[in-house]
Structures are given as C-alpha cells and as structure tokens.
Amino acid sequence: MIKGHGIDIEELVAIERAYLKNARFAKKVLTEAELSRFEELSGKRKIEFLAGRWAAKEAFSKAWGTGIGKLRFQDLEILNDRQGAPYFSRSPFTGKVWISLSHAAGLVTASVILEENDES
C-alpha cells in the first residue's frame, strides 16, 4: 500500500548559487558516501548531482509527511546501482522507497513513493 508520494522541482542555477556562495552547502546536503561521488564529478554534472540529491531528499520528506526540518538531509542517502539507477540506501522508512530523477531545461525533478510492506 502507498504510504506517501512526494515531488520536488529545483532550478539548477539556484542550487549552483547556493553551492558557490557556501562550499559547506554540499556537506549539509550530502552524506559522506554521496560527497565522495560528488567530488569525482566536474562542471555541470556536479551541480546536477547535488541538485538531484537535494530534490530527492525534499521529495522524500514530503512523502514522509514531515518536510525537511523534522528530517535531516543526513538521515537520507541516495546511491546508484550498477546500471546507474538511484536508490535510497538510508532512510527512516522501513518499506520500499521508489525514486525517479529527471534533468531537463535547467531543472531537476524528483518523485518519491513510499510503499508499505505487505503484512498479509
């Protein structure tokens, strides 16, 4: 059963401005493992990665029903599988977490669905 669905959309330029203004911005948003991957990237791809993680974590917090505030960015970790698909490797939700990210026209969108485990 679906517990929640959250969507977020961000402008890449807004995330880039925040990052350029304060280098600690990435450390606030990203876990150690995410930061390691982030530091391997360069240019536009680096900003897309950071914006994608930001949007996905915001979308999760909306699906969870708390928003960021009751939930910290560090409570959530998104890694990529062998095919490059993102997945939540850390979250407070014990069920299945579905995530979709898309980048286009200077925007990133994230959709997160929380599905409770069947207990029947």
From Swiss-Prot:
GO terms for cellular component: cytoplasm. Pfam families: ACPS. It is found in: Cytoplasm. Its EC number is 2.7.8.7. Keywords: Cytoplasm, Fatty acid biosynthesis, Fatty acid metabolism, Lipid biosynthesis, Lipid metabolism, Magnesium, Metal-binding, Transferase. GO terms for biological process: fatty acid biosynthetic process. InterPro entries: 4-PPantetheinyl_Trfase_dom, 4-PPantetheinyl_Trfase_dom_sf, ACPS, Ppantetheine-prot_Trfase_dom. Its cofactor is Mg(2+). Mg(2+) binds at residues 8, 58. It catalyses: apo-[ACP] + CoA = holo-[ACP] + adenosine 3',5'-bisphosphate + H(+). GO terms for molecular function: holo-[acyl-carrier-protein] synthase activity; magnesium ion binding. Belongs to the P-Pant transferase superfamily. AcpS family. Transfers the 4'-phosphopantetheine moiety from coenzyme A to a Ser of acyl-carrier-protein. This is Holo-[acyl-carrier-protein] synthase. The gene is acpS.
